Regions:
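Nucleotide-activated chemistry modules centered on ATP-dependent adenylation/adenylyltransferase
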Residues: 1-235
Length: 235
């Protein structure tokens, strides 16, 4: 049976992505990430329990909540010391929220690559959706993330990236006999783009920052921590 690591927040997007992969024959391993700006991480396990009850322990595994604060700090360190003029001159205009989301998502992906190598998993799934108005969930960025995973012989899947209608999203649960109400964690940093924002400008800046500043850091971080089990709690 093929194995897939699922970035699982307990929300509807990650839950539906999990269901779709189970239906495709995957054994799924759910992992939740905490960047230390999360509330309600305990809620995530409730979503796992619902999936386990419906699909069985053999198909659904739960890895728990893993701390990515250290990786996140390494990625944001240089950028947080830049003046606004340096950011604009070197990368273009970007909102603070979209940079935070870019660095956080990349931290999740770096940790996912490490976990996949440790557990011999060849697939990762993320519930990213174009319609959510995050720069990192647009096709231009998703394709770059696919390239990153390919370097490590891992395929990242975005099962619902083209799903635009939240009404249809809920129906996907209902037709499977699942109530579309969920318990999920809440990130305090994640703020989607305003519909009136010049999102192409921010998207292009996100791409520049990823390629020039963040991507060069990924392999050194992976090599440094590849044999370390990610932390569950801080002592």
């Amino acid at each position: 049976m093929k194995k897939a690591l699922i970035l699982f927040s307990g929300g509807k997007d990650s839950m539906l992505s999990t269901i779709l992969l189970i239906e495709q024959g995957f054994q799924v391993y759910l992992v939740h990430y905490d960047n230390s700006f999360e509330l309600g991480s305990i809620n995530v396990k409730k979503g796992y329990k619902r999936l386990e009850k419906k699909y069985g322990k053999d198909k659904v595994k739960y890895l728990g909540t893993k701390k990515i604060s250290g990786i996140f700090r390494e990625l944001i360190k240089d950028f947080y010391n830049y003046k606004s003029s340096e950011i604009i001159n070197n990368y273009g205009e970007i909102s603070i929220s979209q940079f935070n989301c870019l660095a956080c998502r990349l931290a999740m992906y770096i940790q996912s690559i490490i976990i996949c190598k440790q557990l011999n998993i060849s697939y990762v799934a993320d519930g990213a959706r174009n319609s959510q108005l995050f720069a990192i969930e647009q096709d231009e960025m998703l394709n770059l993330f696919k390239e990153l995973f390919k370097k490590y012989n891992i395929n990242i899947l975005f099962p619902i990236k083209n799903l635009e209608d939240d009404f249809q999203l809920k129906n996907e649960f209902l037709v499977r006999g699942i109530i579309p109400k969920v318990n999920e964690s809440q990130c305090l940093l994640g703020i989607p783009l305003n519909k009136n924002t010049k999102d192409k400008e921010i998207l292009n800046s996100s791409i520049n920052i990823y390629k020039k500043l963040l991507l060069p850091k990924t392999n050194p971080i992976i090599e440094r921590y590849k044999n370390i089990k990610p932390g569950d709690n801080y002592l």
